[in-house]
Amino acid sequence: MHPIKLCARSPRPSSKKRKRPAAAAATPPESEPEPVHNTAACNSEGENNATGKRREHNNKKMKEEKSKRKKKQGEGKKGSGILTDKLFSDLPISDLTANAIRDMNYTHLTEIQARSIPPLMLGSDVMASAKTGSGKTLAFLIPAIELLCRLRFSPRNGTGVIVLCPTRELAIQTHNVAKELMRYHSQTLGYVIGGIDLRGEAEQLAKGINVLVATPGRLLDHMQKTKSFKYECLKCLIIDEADRILEQNFEEQMKQIFKLLPRQGRQTVLFSATQTEKVEDFAKLTFGSKEERQRTLVYVGVDDHESKATVEGLKQGYCVIPSERRFLVLYAFLKKALSEKTKVMVFFSSCNSVKFHAQLLNFIQIECYDIHGQLKQHQRTSTFFKFHKAEHGILLCTNVAARGLDIPDVDYIVQYDPPDETKDYIHRVGRTARGDNGKGSAILFLLPKELQLLIHLKAANISVSEYVFRQELVPKLQPYLHYDSSFEQEKIVGGNYILNRSAKEAYKSYLLAYKSHSMKDIFAIHQLDLTSVAASFCFSEPPKVNLDLESSASKHRKKRNVNTGRRHGIGPSNPYGRKGSDDRRQFARF
């Protein structure tokens, strides 16, 4: 197989043109006369020319932006990609919602929207699944908003619709989509998520939030603690990314939420990207017995007969890279991506790994954003919106950004650390090639001993090609990253206390994540070459770490509390101490 020069590949197909920089678009031709800075001396002809040029430039810019929006939303391309030939204008919805959809530049429904909106409008319980980026958010929001509009819901009625999301970022994104849909409606909208002041949210709930977007833990907190939270008139409960909610150990919280919520007269909706056994079990809890579900539940499975688990516009590949060269390959790839002004998301297995690589890359002038679970909520939200608005850039993240987030124009998904399960792979790569005719590429980094993962991907209808990096593309950066005693000068990581400490924490977290991987037959920690792994974290030799997963600070404290907490072991049951109990010669009893 001939080596593929992957990082030199064009980030987008030639048919998809990137918008020219504003500075280049506004550059005047050489024949244009010098501008007159004294406005009082300008004649009418010069003013008209300048005004005409500005108007022409503004019109051109508006046309470019409109063309970009049309291309993104697939306007005028009925029946292509994921869109159908059905129009939003044909739906039996209010003029208020129709006008909002028109403002959002949507014209044609996607498959999941065309199949799920009609039964939802009729009030049926729906359990739906579709690939990521297929338009599920609009599919459940439009009927829910229309329901409250028909009932003339007002703040005094309390909460009529609850949308549950697994992550804070997805909740904020869903809230923003609902805000656009409800711009002409009188109903109120809000969200409650972790990381934000509980008292401030309680004050908003007391005023009455008709459509509430929430994460399960924070919703349960308010249901149990906020007395002014009115949800007795709840008409619709929507659970988005139901499979992910169950993965994040929200199952017990969900059971408590279901006990507290009114069941009679409530429509229940489950949306997910994959159908798993846990989702089926969750459906039993949500919709009742099998007989009851068969009688009342409408199941919409858009991808049930699809031969591929991912979208058509996605190019997928993997690279077999030894541990010691992983960071060097990533560095070369990201440096090329920056020069080509592409948008890249890189997934890691732990928060500490994201923190270290973000610090290191920014230190060596590869600017990047980072999102992980250890950041405060305002930092996560700010970073998400910065990357969302950016035309190009790099985002390092954990699986917290792998589900539901709709970030426009992502060119590459790099899975630096392999996913824990095949469905995690699907959701990670789902951040690119979104929408109708979306294009993107996904690259998976694998060690030589991890190639059996491809068998699991193939069993899940995921087809990936092998990419080979040419060695000359990888910079000779390794000697300058770790501290080498053979040199008399400090290196980047070895000589920087913060980077060195961060690298140790990332190294330990990587090994812990590897040890807890669900596919232990493939990801076996005892097969790792720790020296090579340490080299990928910029160490010349493996740092000493404790890999006992069962150990914790509390357990150590409990051990120390034995015999009244004294290390010498002296206590009521053993007055002679730890040594004295085994050595009769040390103490004599009289």
Curated annotation (Swiss-Prot):
GO molecular function term, any single one: ATP binding
Biased composition (Basic residues): 554-569
EC code(s) of this entry: 3.6.4.13
Organism: Oryza sativa subsp. japonica
GO CC annotations on file: nucleolus
Entry protein name: Putative DEAD-box ATP-dependent RNA helicase 51
Residue ranges constituting the Helicase C-terminal domain according to the UniProt record: 329-481
UniProt feature, compositional bias: Polar residues: 40-51
Keywords assigned: ATP-binding, Helicase, Hydrolase, Nucleotide-binding, RNA-binding
Catalysis: reaction(s): ATP + H2O = ADP + phosphate + H(+)
Enzyme type, top EC level: hydrolase
UniProt-annotated binding residues for ATP: A130, K131, T132, G133, S134, G135, K136, T137
Stretch list, region Disordered: 1-81, 549-590
Domain of life according to the entry: Eukaryota
Motif (DEAD box): 240-243
Entry comment, domain topic: The Q motif is unique to and characteristic of the DEAD box family of RNA helicases and controls ATP binding and hydrolysis.
